[in-house]
Amino acid sequence: MHGRRLRMPLAAAAAILAAVSLSGCISQKNPVATFQVVDETYKIELTTPELQQHARDLLAGEDVASIPNGVVVRDDPGVNAPWSWHIDPASLEFADNTIEVCDGLPSYVEDGTVTSDRYCPWSAEIVSID
């Protein structure tokens, strides 16, 4: 009888410890930067510490490369809803200059006016990091 009483609390304790240990393994969501392009906004996930710091520097007004440039993933909004596309976070870089073919408004990506596989809005300004 004593063995059963002891097993039950030990089993419960083991289950609680396992749950606590596993919850520590769950990764935190990456920050998401919101950019304003004229009167439209779009969002990009920041997946590396370097990109996160660069975005914070931009938000603070530092003089760093400011044009977000990345590969467009169509038919998947990701963090960029309500748009039907997002920027592949693994391809994101910030540039001082880019070619004109990837410049434009987020709505131009949406409607296919921007035909490049990359999006690099020259007038983009970071407005928040969440």
Residue ranges of each PLM-predicted region?
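Bacterial N-terminal signal peptides that target proteins for export
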Residues: 2-12
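C-terminal motif of bacterial Sec signal peptides marking the signal peptidase cleavage site
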Residues: 21-24
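Function-determining sites in protein domains
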Residues: 26-130
